[in-house]
Amino acid sequence: MNTIAPNLDGKHLRIGIVQARFTNEIGSQMLKVCCRTLQELGVADENITVATVPGALEIPIALMNFASSEKFDALIAIGVVIRGETYHFELVANESGAGIGRVALDYNIPIANAVLTTENDAQAIERIGEKASDAAKVAVECANLVNLLLEEQFEDEE
């Protein structure tokens, strides 16, 4: 049996991040934690590109444009959707999540989804560090995995 070990070496990786500004006080903290973790994993600061969008529903279109540029090894989506008193929460949570997944599959690029969906601000604040750090690790590990698999596929075709 062949096993591919997880690789968290971010050296030489290019990471794009899209952060929703709605609930920015939480999202901006997540962005800081995420970038710090990427740097700890070896991703050079000049290889991290950040774009912000108004809200979670706009994240997929920005990710799609990052992905279509073919300049990135992985992408990260950061945002916060907090339940209110209307159905809008479900719409935003479901549609942003579906859009993020669609971009990943359509463009064959790993996307770490760090869009929090919580009942209240306190739950979101509690999850800032872990979710943002995990997103950075997921992006690096999956970028390395996809790059390795693509290299092997290319070698098999020769």
Curated annotation (Swiss-Prot):
It catalyses: (2S)-2-hydroxy-3-oxobutyl phosphate + 5-amino-6-(D-ribitylamino)uracil = 6,7-dimethyl-8-(1-D-ribityl)lumazine + phosphate + 2 H2O + H(+). Keywords: Riboflavin biosynthesis, Transferase. It is an enzyme of class 2 (transferase). GO terms for cellular component: cytosol; riboflavin synthase complex. The gene is ribH. Gene3D superfamilies: Lumazine/riboflavin synthase. (2S)-2-hydroxy-3-oxobutyl phosphate binds at residues 85-86, 127. GO terms for biological process: riboflavin biosynthetic process. It holds the Pfam family DMRL_synthase. Pathway: Cofactor biosynthesis; riboflavin biosynthesis; riboflavin from 2-hydroxy-3-oxobutyl phosphate and 5-amino-6-(D-ribitylamino)uracil: step 1/2. Belongs to the DMRL synthase family. GO terms for molecular function: 6,7-dimethyl-8-ribityllumazine synthase activity. InterPro entries: LS (IPR034964), LS/RS (IPR002180), LS/RS_sf (IPR036467). This is 6,7-dimethyl-8-ribityllumazine synthase. Catalyzes the formation of 6,7-dimethyl-8-ribityllumazine by condensation of 5-amino-6-(D-ribitylamino)uracil with 3,4-dihydroxy-2-butanone 4-phosphate. This is the penultimate step in the biosynthesis of riboflavin. It comes from Neisseria gonorrhoeae (strain ATCC 700825 / FA 1090). Its EC number is 2.5.1.78. 5-amino-6-(D-ribitylamino)uracil binds at residues 22, 56-58, 80-82, 113. Signal peptide: none annotated. The active site is at residue 88. The lineage of its organism: Bacteria, Pseudomonadati, Pseudomonadota, Betaproteobacteria, Neisseriales.
